[in-house]
Design a protein with these regions (language model features):
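Switch/communication elements of ASCE P-loop NTPase nucleotide-binding domains
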Residues: 1-50, 258-261, 266-349
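Conserved N-terminal strand/loop that marks the beginning of ABC ATPase nucleotide-binding domains
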Residues: 1-9, 93-97, 200
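Short, solvent-exposed secondary-structure boundary motifs
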Residues: 7-8, 101-103, 249-255
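Conserved P-loop NTP-binding catalytic core
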Residues: 39-118
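Electropositive, glycine-dotted interaction segments
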Residues: 94-242, 246
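Active-site phosphate/pyrophosphate- and oxyanion-stabilizing loops and adjacent acidic/basic residues
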Residues: 190, 250, 330
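Extended helical coiled-coil dimerization/tether regions that scaffold
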Residues: 220-285
């Protein structure tokens, strides 16, 4: 489990260290940096998948993703006597991300991403470069707890005899996670990489008239709902057959008293139907309101038979009627019994 998240110089976040529990809610007004927290978590997951540099470039490169304010605030700026304005930079340009483990057997990780030195002979002179990486055990990075150290192209691994240098250099555009996750020499790196790859993110479920979740879908065992909810019907049926079918029925009834869901199977196609009190026939997914469909998608995501180590939800309350929020909260709390959960949420009003 993670005990803390650290972000420095990312978009609207100058420096943030946030404690994490089994269930953590990140909330605040618009512009307070909630979305930056979510996107920073996505970048950390991209490191384990080898895509962090590409993701940063898609966001506009370091020039667009770095802290948008001045390097330092003068006393006059803090008092409001003068407007906030840029100052002469005295520190290296660096985006820093990391997290700490909760227990001694958990691993922590940190990365420092900066600008490349002037290299006139390459067309990739604007690509961000990974400057430093570190892995340690437990909640604090100390010389006694550090297990892996990467500085520039040089990688060192710690074993029972001390620090051992790895002969092969690490490219500046690649993480040590993907370049040297050796089960013999660096088992902690391999373990941490697979943990980070298992992190699961849900950001936005489509609920428009053409949303994939409204259409009949190919049916196959689906223990993990797709990010866009394409396989809703198959995911719900998988929960019923190999997951907690009673929890599924209870979650539907908690939000819609007297209602139930059914998965209609027509050949290789699955379709979601919802029975509601007072109606003579079930409603298909195409007929459901946006809020009802989104709630069913959250049920499928949160009651997964294959819970991840970390589940990150971005504004799950979007498009839900206020009456559904208590049931959603209970559903999220139930998911937190199986996974560590981080919820990014906008406060009501």
């Amino acid at each position: 489990m993670l005990s803390a998240l650290a972000i420095a110089n990312y978009r609207s976040l100058r420096q943030l260290t946030a404690p994490l529990g089994r269930l953590t809610v990140v909330t605040g007004a618009n512009g307070s940096g909630k979305s930056s927290v979510y996107r920073a978590m996505r970048l950390l997951a991209d490191i384990a998948n080898g895509g962090v540099i590409r993701s940063l470039v898609r966001e506009g490169g370091l020039s667009s993703t770095l802290w948008a304010g001045p390097e330092r605030f003068s006393a006059a700026m803090l008092r409001g006597d003068v407007p906030v304005q840029g100052t002469t930079r005295s520190e290296p340009v660096a985006l820093k991300l990391g997290f700490a483990g909760a227990e001694a057997e958990d691993f922590g990780y940190a990365i420092d991403i900066g600008l490349p030195p002037p290299i006139p002979s390459t067309a990739f002179s604007h690509d961000p470069q990974i400057k430093h990486e570190a892995i340690w055990s437990g909640p604090l990075l100390r010389p006694s707890t550090q297990l892996v150290d990467r500085k520039g192209a040089a990688l060192r691994l710690r074993d029972g005899k001390g620090w051992q240098a790895v002969g092969r250099p690490i490219p500046a555009f690649a993480s040590m996670m993907t370049e040297h996750a050796d089960p013999r020499d660096a088992p902690e790196m391999l373990t941490l990489r697979e943990q980070m790859r298992s992190w699961r993110f849900y950001d936005h479920f489509r609920s428009d008239a053409d949303a994939p979740a409204r259409q009949p879908q190919l049916g196959t065992y689906t223990p993990v709902l797709a990010n866009d909810g394409t396989d809703l019907a198959a995911a719900l049926q998988t929960i019923r057959e190999i997951g907690d079918g009673e929890a599924l029925d209870s979650a539907v009834d908690d939000a819609f008293p007297g209602a139930g869901i059914e998965i209609r199977v027509n050949g290789d196609r699955f379709e979601t139907l919802m029975h509601q009190h007072g109606l003579l026939r079930p409603l298909t997914a195409a007929e459901l309101s946006d809020g009802t469909l989104r709630y069913l998608l959250w049920i499928a995501a949160l009651l997964t038979p294959r819970p991840p180590a970390l589940l990150v939800l971005n504004e799950p309350e979007t498009s839900l009627h206020p009456d559904l929020l208590p049931a959603l909260g209970r559903l999220i709390a139930q998911a937190a019994r199986q996974s560590q959960v981080i919820v990014v949420s906008t406060p009501p009003g």
